[in-house]
């Protein structure tokens, strides 16, 4: 932190600090803390932006204008977008900034034993939510000694990341971060740390996407439309297998390849040429444990070891869809679609 000698140098008398010097010190201290936050996050491989909460108005306006123009499927809007809250939380009403973070995450390959066979299925990046707690703890440890706090947010993270320059959209409407591709998890925290940064530009697409159509060809559900910027999210396999409704009849069972989510448009993407090989081994579920999952048992009825494995994958809150998705992969009637990535 700044020494008293530097502080005194900016004032007429070391015993009396001028108003201008006090303001200068406060501004320097805020900038110093912001840079300290960014450096600490970068030490863990993360990238971040700190922007003024004024960006909230732009985010809300962007979502609502799309909705009013009829660009968003009504069911998708109701289930996925109406949950956002474009104002600081009650426990931090004086929030002045948003700390937007991209944390690198790998593919995780989990093993399920069923009918005597070990079957391996992928969980894509973004589902490992435990890193949110780790990031919040790091921010708290960094800012709390100087009297600043943080609080979680409920915001459209992809739009926020792109508008603040942290990421860029791919043609598949997935976010890409420099050095990570789409292998990351986004998060944002409110803070009462002041910020004058207000870079809220229009959504940008990766330059190489303009001459590439790999994801369009790879998308089984035709959710990626070459004639419009927005994804037909209501057709996206990720939306369908994260939703509790039955799969539509037009979904070919062979399209399923992840326990949740989809990687078809990401594994083929040139931006992921490096990250696509980042696969980590996940937990192994015994035949008994796999059977419990297929039996639709709620989390509270599962043994602690089994619940812990689900938490490791970030799927402990997805038990309303996981049994159905697992059945689609295993296919209890005989065939077993592969989940090779």
Model-derived regions, located:
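Iron-sulfur cluster-binding cysteine motifs and their immediate structural context
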Residues: 214-238, 254-286
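Auxiliary alpha/beta "docking" domains used to position bulky ligands
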Residues: 1-10, 15, 24-208
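Cys/His-clustered metal-coordination modules, chiefly Zn-binding fingers
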Residues: 190, 196-247
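Conserved hydrophobic register position within alpha-solenoid helical repeats
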Residues: 322-327
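Short Fe-S-cluster ligation motifs
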Residues: 240, 244-260, 292-315
């Amino acid at each position: 932190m700044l020494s008293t000698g530097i502080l005194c140098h900016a004032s007429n008398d070391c015993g009396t600090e001028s108003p201008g010097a006090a303001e200068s010190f406060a501004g320097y201290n805020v900038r110093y803390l912001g840079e300290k936050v960014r450096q600490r996050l970068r030490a863990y491989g993360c990238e971040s932006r700190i922007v003024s909460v004024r960006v909230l108005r732009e985010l809300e306006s962007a979502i609502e204008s799309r909705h009013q123009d009829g660009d968003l499927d009504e069911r998708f809007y109701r289930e996925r977008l109406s949950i956002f809250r474009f104002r600081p939380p009650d426990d931090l009403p004086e929030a002045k900034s948003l700390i937007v973070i991209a944390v690198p995450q790998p593919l995780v390959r989990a093993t399920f034993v069923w009918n005597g066979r070990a079957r391996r299925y992928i969980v894509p990046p973004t589902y490992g939510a435990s890193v949110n707690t780790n990031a919040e703890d790091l921010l708290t440890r960094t800012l709390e000694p100087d009297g600043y706090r943080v609080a979680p947010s409920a915001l459209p993270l992809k739009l926020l990341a792109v508008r603040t320059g942290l990421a860029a959209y791919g043609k598949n409407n997935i976010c890409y971060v420099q050095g990570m591709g789409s292998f990351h998890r986004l998060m944002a925290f409110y803070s009462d740390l002041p910020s004058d940064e207000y870079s809220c530009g229009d959504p940008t697409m990766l330059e190489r996407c303009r001459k590439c159509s790999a994801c369009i060809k790879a998308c089984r559900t035709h959710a990626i439309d070459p004639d419009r910027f927005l994804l037909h999210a209501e057709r996206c396999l990720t939306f369908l297998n994260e939703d509790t409704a039955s799969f539509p009849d037009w979904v070919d069972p062979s399209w399923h390849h992840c326990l949740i989510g989809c990687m078809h448009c990401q594994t083929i993407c040139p931006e992921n040429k490096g990250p696509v090989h980042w696969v980590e081994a996940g937990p192994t579920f015994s035949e008994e444990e796999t059977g419990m999952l297929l039996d639709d048992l709620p989390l509270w009825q599962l043994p602690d070891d089994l619940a812990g494995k689900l938490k490791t994958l970030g799927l402990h809150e997805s038990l309303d869809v996981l049994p159905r998705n697992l059945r689609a992969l295993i296919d209890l009637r005989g065939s077993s679609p592969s989940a090779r990535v």
